[in-house]
Structure formats: structure tokens, C-alpha cells
């Protein structure tokens, strides 16, 4: 068993056990699921759900004035301004963007020196801003006059009163962590701990206090012990109530004069106005609510047609609750994780949850209600989940793989969507497996057995349903036709064989193909590819940055690389998405970063300088506020009870400030405990993975950014998905026996459907069958009409058996066998030599030597030993493994003794040798005269003298030789047996009396196939011709015997009187050249006759007048098997291994499939599938409507053609001394029955299913009569 098969079996077993758990304890599981839903939706109670994202509108700074409050001043005039751009904004936001670095960097500096000194300069900047005064001709303006004055915080924010300003200007900076007191900052030994002390204990929310005070996202700030880029970024946020252009201009000029940025190219041209809609908008919820209402109605009206469901409303409501709960859980978890949507792509997330959730509901419902209805509820739930386990896990793994690939493209839009999708998939899978499955088990449990029988329509009790393409005239006949007394009616599993309405067909089509999920996955892949291709700061930038950072070249080896500003910006604020600036510190190979210092490292006395990093500015720095959560500004104003719903704010152009600090300032600002603390990690980590470090010197709680854990978890999941992907590719690209010298080691392989394993092993039983003995050689032809069974061996002996009791009713002697019944293995050897000596040609003297055409070996004649003596080497028995069966003490009526010699005397060889001499003489006469001599008394008289069936227990009769030829084909209908011989003779025998009724005496080409249908006989001959006969029965008043030679016209053939009825056989039509080569397959049904030949063609004839309707061409080899039924569905198989389905009404080919590696040996169809077997010892089951291969069953060697269909959902196959029963719908091995110890070494060569639920197995010269086990009758 391969790794994939073991994994599939484990998954199936896990789902089976989970189904048993859900069905056994439904109430506790529903309560547990409800608590989980409430817990995941708890964040929604505190954090209101957003409607849509904020809307932006830009205006130029030059000549800006607030719009008038009267919205009617421009009515009737076309304008590009939005409707909400009316009146003054709530506030004007002015950000002073500070970039600071310590340069040049010394090796004795610590990691904490990267941000301690730059943060200390924030206090000086705040003082400069507060002290700025505008003096002009109109007077003086200070900050207190133009800024937004705030009052108290909300009562629930007492912890933030020492951090946020009250009763003054709304001015925010990182200094607020220390109440804008430099002494507090200087005395703080744990800066990072102070910054993160107000962070939530679980995960960061969308707008944290750190983001509010720093004004930039946390990963862009550079305040981290593990960042490689020694640059700190933060903003000082000023909130103005009125727009004063002169004051703002003077403030910008003063700050840029005090802290110039020589390489800054930021544009100060536009104001950006941001409008915030209502957080809960009814208009935005209408489409989503409408979608769920439509979902409820669709599921309800669809489940009204499912009779296996008790409560239609309950199932529809459960489906809607499942999908809605999945959405709420997803949004709640995303809110808890801080994953708030900032792009329009996040708004389609609820609708994706609806689509995926609906499809999973349909899949689970279809799988569970398709299980057998007579099983216990928990077993039905377990089987339903187990059957879809592999499909569910495969789809989930595929979706997660696509999401992981999209996440690691490092495109922000794709990452946000992927994070939303991961949460949605996990929550949806959780609810499907727990909530909906449990509710479905409760609903099915309420379905009473009486209620089930009452709801089932009468068509469900029929053995077969209406297949696709059946003419309307057969539908009524099938519905009212009662079952015959000897036909077992097997109840089909659930309702899968019923005529489904269109709405259920749509549901099952979606559930079977998972079309919606596949389209979503394909669309996601295309969308990710487009964004990766068009995003300038995505994966390519990140890879280029990694190559630049990890370059082993020493300092000064390469100069700055000129990069276009539009493609790769010189300094992106995100360390993970940026390249080092041209002057970034490049260390030699033997030099470590400051983060690589070991614990308790002592700074070196000697200082080695490296090139100072140059602070650069790029276009992305102009709108860094866009990377903040869209709740950033509403959260800040909500703290002061100011709402931004249906209002807007205006963002002024950023004021850039660059700070360069020398190492001496960094050393002076260092805390005494910094040198004694292990601040640096043992190894450097990529930028952006770590944003926080240990809390303090005391070894307290470590504040790690959740990004590391997310990346680690996603990386592990990506590795698992990659391994599974490689396994799937191995399974698809490599054959089953890849790397193995032979076939599978097991006796039989299960089906390949995921529903094959239900967690239990199929039972194996052993029964003692009825053994039908009496043939001297291997049985070649079998025929039955339900009550009688006729068999014929290679010796030409025909036996008629009672299919109910197994008794031998009649033995029809072959007219003149050349050997005694004691021949055994000697005659097998003799037959082989005779076949070789005949050269494959049938002669009247040797009628038993010509088997059917496809089995006749050809070869040179044996060398003669003496010139005038016959060759007696054929009498030597070299088969020492075959022993003569001992005579039973009390022979049973149904068992015939194999030998007629007595125990007193030895074996008499005289007759055997004498026959060989006689055969030599007869052969010489045959070669000279080309006409056989008279064999003695006429055959009808011999049959009449022999009488009817011989007495039970009497030895076999010795028959005289004849020129009739060996039997090549055999058919049975009623009490008449039609025999086709190699000499071309057609015989009709009475199966009860054992007498010859009539025959066609004209010597012609051998009859290779027969059809006996409604008193019409069609004989296919070796030369490719067809003969159509009709039988007539006349009641004669006196025994009469007719003599004469039959003619080929309309005159009757010579009938032979039998009992009181005379059967006459008339040749009505002849098709002399139906095919160019021998006809190998012949079938008739629904008034049509189909022939298959070695000339690669099939022909369709009308049975009543032998008119050729169609010539079907589609095979590249000889036709080996043909199937046709009353629904005008025709299937054919050939030596090319192909299977073709044809429409008999139009003569067109419906499908063509290469099914086997070799000849197709047998072919049959049910209402839903096509079953084929081949010389490769595989039985393949195909979907009849689509032509898709469902699964395969590997047979034992030599048992490939031994199969039979008991009903539309039950298949029987033969093996080494056993028969196996399979469920056709799923490929499950239901039961294996061993036929006693005597048959273990014998393969079942042929299986014939009788109408009385009996199975006839051909084990060489013996037949075994087996009845369908009662266990299977109950299962069906």
C-alpha cells in the first residue's frame, strides 16, 4: 500500500469515527459548537462591524478654502466633487514625519542605541512645535489658537489618561508614553516594555495605542531589537480645528530649516479629504441579507424533493445558520486578530463564504442521504462522511495551498485577502463537520421506517430505473410490469436510482463537480498572478533586497546601483519590502551586526567606524498614513466622544524631518542597565520578523510580534501542502506498479473511490456449493433461461441441469465421440495433437477437434514415426497432476461418475487403439473422396432408440462416430436448445426429452454465434454470412417422420417428430456477405440485431427482415464483445482495448474510451454505468452518461472475464476458488464467498447469473451453483 493510499485510509477512518461521534452524541456537540460560535463572535460586541471603507477626495493646497456649508450653491452645475464634500471638516491632520539614525555606527554600540537616542529627540521637537508663534502684520498666532482643543477622555479610558492629552491641544508623539517628560524617558530601563504595556494580551487590534502615538504602523517604526536597518521612523501628529495657511507654512519652514532633509523630494501639493461612512450601514447589508434569504429559499425548495429528509425547513435553516455562523465567526476572529479589511477585495469575503458554505452543505447532504436506508443512523452518517473525506480534505488542502502561495507573494492586497480566506475556510470547515453534520443526523433519525416506505414512489422498488435516452414507449411498460416469481427484486440503495427532478440534478451536479470552489480557486490564482505581475513593491523587490543584504562582498566593493524610482524606490518604509540605501552599512565577512553580539558582551575599546547610513525619502513616504488601519482616525476621535460617521477629515501634506545623531549622543543617552542586559538575539533575523524584544532586565514577559508566529505556522502548513502536492503528482504521473517487477501483492485491490473504505473489513465466508459434475472435458458453452441450465464441453457433450436443484435432467449425446469416457488426460493430449494435425480446419470425421475460432491453436503436424503405422504418441498421458476421481460409494443423483470400467478387470486399451486405426482409415477416405461415409443408423433414430434421459447412476453411453462436427455455439429458450456446429449444421433439440427436433443438413461454414429470440434464430457463420431462421410448432395427430434434404428457400426444413408437437425450422433470409471476415460477436434486442466482426466493423440489422440499417466504424481492431439492451444502447469492445458507446436509433458514436491494455473480453451495462473486463485482468466501471472511469477492480490471473451483474447496484466477480460481491455505486467489496476447499486452486473462468438469484461458476469441467448470500439481500 502506497503512502497516498495509507493517508487516504487514515483520513477515511478519522471521518468515519467523527461521524459516529456526531451521530452518537448530538446534543453535547451542538451545545459545544454553539459556545464556540458565541466565543468567536464575542469581539463583534465590542468592536462594531465596519460598513465600507473610507472614501477619499483630493484638492490642491494652493488656494484651498473650506467648502461652503450650503450644499445648494452649485445645484444644476456639473462637478467632480462628491456629495459629502460640504462644509468644513471635523479636523485638519498635520503629521511631522521624523526619520532618525545614528551615524556613523560603531561596533561597541548596542541594539538599544538604535532607537533610544532618536526617540529622545521627540521631546525637543514637541517643544519646538509648541513654542512656535506666527508673527505678522495682523498679530501673533500660536498653536493653542489654531489647534483642536479636547476635553476629558471617555469614562472607560482611565488607563489612557496619562498617555493621551486632555484639556489642551490634541498633539500626539511617542513622548506621550512618558508624559512628554524627558527625565522619565531617560530613567526608563525598558523602553520597549513601556511602549507595549498597553497592548492587548491576546493579539493586537486594528488601532493600537502604539500606532496612535507613533503615527506609523509598528513594523515601519524601526523600534525593535532585531531590525537590520538602523533607522527609526515616527510622526508627531497635530490636529487643527481651523485651516490657517500662514501658520502652517511658517511651521513647515521653521522645522525644515532646523532639521533639513537635503535629498527629500516629497511634494506638498494636495490635501486629502477622507470621508467615513456609517460603521453599520443598512444599505450595505441589504445585498448580503438578500443573498442569505435566497440561499434559504433555494435549499428549502431543493430539499422538498429529497424524501430522505424529515424536516425541509429544519435542514434549510440549519444550512443558513451554518453559513451565517461561519461568516460571523470569520469576521469575529479577523477582528480579534486585527485583520480589518482596507481594500475592496475584503468586501467580497462574505459572499465567498456563502458560496463555499452552500457547496459543502450540498456535498454532505448528498453523501449522507445516498447511503443505504436500512442501516443505523450513526452508520449512515459515518459512511457519508467517510465517502467524502478524501474529496473534502483534497479541496481544503488545495485551497490552503493557493492561499499560502498568495500570502508569500508579499503583496499587501493579496496577503490581506489570504488571511481573511484562511480564517473563513477554517471556521466553515469547523461548522460543517460539527454543527451541520450533527443536525443532519438528528433529522435523519426522525425519519421513521414506515414514513420512509410511505414516501418512496413505486418506481423505487423496480430492479432498474429509467436510464438516459430511453424511449417514452418503454416507460409505461416498465412501471406496470410485475416481477416474475423467480426474479429477486433488490431494493436499491436509498433513492439514487429514482428519476431525479431538475432541481436535485442541479444540486447533485454542483456537489459532484464542486464547480463553485474550482472556479473560485481558478479566479484566485489568476487574480494573484495579475497582482504579482503588476505590483512594483512585491516579491521582486523583496528578493532583490535579500540578495543585496546577504551579498558576501566586502565594504566598498560595489557602488550604489541606480534604480528607477518608479520601480524600486530608494527607501521604502517597510523593512521587509525595501532595499538598503546606497550608503547602508555593509559589513565584512568576519564582522557581525550589533544584533549578533553574544550575551553579556563587553564593548570593545577600539572603535571601528562604518559608513553612515543616508536617510532617504521616497514617494511612498507622502502617504504613509494609508498603511494605517482605516479605524485609526475614528478610534482616536472616539476617545474624545467625537464621531466621524458621515463626516470627513482633511490630511495636510507631510512635513519631513531628518535627524542625524552621532555615536557620542547615543552613548550619552544610554541607560546604565543597557550594557548589562542581553539585548541582542544570538542570530540576526530578517527585517520585519521581530518588532519587539524582552520586556526588561528582570526576565519578565517577552513581547513578540505575532507576525513571527503567523509566518512560522504558515511555513509549516506550506511544507505539508508541498509534500502532499508531490505525492499527488507521483500518484498521477507514475503507474500503480511503478518500480515493481510484477503486479500487486494482494489477492484483490479495492475500488479507487474515496468511499471505498468505511472503516470495516468486508466479511469473508465459506459455503458448500452445488457441484455439477458430468463433463469429460472443459466446459465451453453455457446458456440458461432461468429454470434450466445447459452446458457443453469440448467433447461435444451437452448436459441439461435443473437450475433450482442442480439435478442433471438430460444428457444429449454428441453424435459419435471418438473416445471413451475414461480418457481423462490422455484424451486432452490426444486432442491437442489432433488440433495441430488438423491445421485448424474442421472435418466431418473429426467433429470434436474444432473449438471456436479465437481459441484454436495453429501449428505444424506432428512428425510421423512410421510410414505405414498410425501415430500413437497422442495416447500417452503426460498430465500427472490430474488423477481419476474415485468412484463414490453412493453416487448422488446430480453427480455423474467419470469412468465406466469395472474394478475387477484392468483397463482395456484395445478399443482405444482400434479407434486410432479406424480414424486413420476414415481420414484417408476423407482425403480421397471428400465425402464422409455413412456413419451408420440415422441420428434421429439413434436418439429415439436411446430414449429420454438415462437412468441416474448408469454409466455413460457409448456413441457412434458422426460427421456433425463440434459445437461452437449454444442457445436456450423455453425447452428448446439450438446448437451451432463447426460443420455449419444447425440443430434444435428438446431439452426435456433429449431428442433432436429438427436440423439444417446443408454443409456450410461453421456457426460462430447464435441468437435465439422470440422463435427467431440467427446464425453467424465463419465466412461472415448471416442466416435468419424461424421456428414453427405444429401439433401432429400421428407420429410421422419426414425425410428429405432441407433447402434454402421458403420450403420448410426436415423436421423430426417429437412427442405430439412437430418443430419446423425455416430459413427465411440470408445475408451472404454481412462482413468480410468471420463474425465474432452477435447480440439482439429491441428488434435489432448487432454483429461484430474481425473486419473492425459492427453492423445493425432489423431482426424482422434482415435489413442492414447501419455500419458502425470506430474500432482499430477486431470486435470481441457486443452489448445491446431494450433501451437501444449499444456498447462494443475490441482487440484494441477500446470501448465504444453507440446510439442505435441514429447510428452515431456517443463516446470512445481506451479501457484496457489488451482485448476487451466482456462488456455489460446497467442504468448508470458500463462494466468491462479485459485480458489485463482488470474490471473497469465507467459512468454511462459521461464516460468517466469511476474505479477499477483487479482480478486474479485468468479471471478477468468472470463477472456478472445481479442488479443495478450489485456485481459479482470470480477469483481463485471464490466469488466476490461488490457495490457498483461506490466500488465497495461487500462480501467474499469461498466455494469450498476443492475449488481453491481453480480460477472461475465464467460466471452466469440466473434469474432465481443463483450464480453458476465455470471451474473447468465442473460447474458450481451458488445462491446470493442472504446478507447481500438485506444490504440491498
UniProtKB/Swiss-Prot annotation:
Coiled coil residues, start to end: none
Residues modified to Phosphoserine: 821, 837, 843, 850, 905, 934
Gene: Scap
Chief location bin: endoplasmic reticulum
Positions of the UniProt region annotated as Disordered: 60-81, 834-903, 928-958
Region (Loop-7) location: 535-710
Cellular component per GO, a single term: ER to Golgi transport vesicle membrane
Protein name: Sterol regulatory element-binding protein cleavage-activating protein
Subunit structure: Membrane region forms a homotetramer. Component of the SCAP-SREBP complex (composed of SCAP and SREBF1/SREBP1 or SREBF2/SREBP2); interacts with SREBF1/SREBP1 or SREBF2/SREBP2 through its C-terminal cytoplasmic domain. Forms a ternary complex with INSIG1 or INSIG2 through its transmembrane domains at high sterol concentrations. Interacts with PAQR3; the interaction anchors the SCAP-SREBP complex to the Golgi apparatus in low cholesterol conditions. Interacts with the SEC23-SEC24 complex in a SAR1-GTP-dependent manner through an ER export signal in its third cytoplasmic loop.
Database matches in InterPro entries: Beta-prop_SCAP, HMGCR/SNAP/NPC1-like_SSD, SCAP, SCAP_N, SSD, WD40/YVTN_repeat-like_dom_sf, WD40_repeat_CS, WD40_repeat_dom_sf
Glycosylation site list: 263, 590, 641
UniProt free text on domains: Loop-1 binds to loop-7, enabling interaction with COPII-coated vesicles. When levels of cholesterol in the endoplasmic reticulum increase, Loop-1 binds to cholesterol instead, thereby disrupting direct binding between the two loops and preventing the SCAP-SREBP complex from exiting the endoplasmic reticulum.
